[in-house]
């Protein structure tokens, strides 16, 4: 069994999605997930993961931060994004006034990058796991697939069929 935790780059279960191509999966990725939400989803499922199971983490952007589930956000109005967390750029583009002022007051790149790194460090310790990202990242322990996304943008996990197939091939290489 392959367990998947991550953001929208892993959330689709369509036939052409890399998450379907790679085999028998339990997919707990969700659109707009912060790294904290990815950690929490993993911790909830950890008791169900068997010793020989594979765990895939699709790490998100350092600038996506957790938002409690009972808070309103325009992105959460979409049925596909009910647990969407805040990403700095979206808040400003969508004019989320209730968050703009707070973020302008508290935002500190160093702090949010440090918290992100602490969570990633914890997840890197998960046995039998592989780590991917589609965002630019200085982390060398994480397989960076940003170039695949940029060259193959589309509707399934933000990629076209070719992009999803390429990601599946890379994951299959990691597993063997």
Language-model segments: which ranges?
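Serine-esterase "nucleophile elbow" of acetyl-processing enzymes
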Residues: 1-41, 47-48, 160
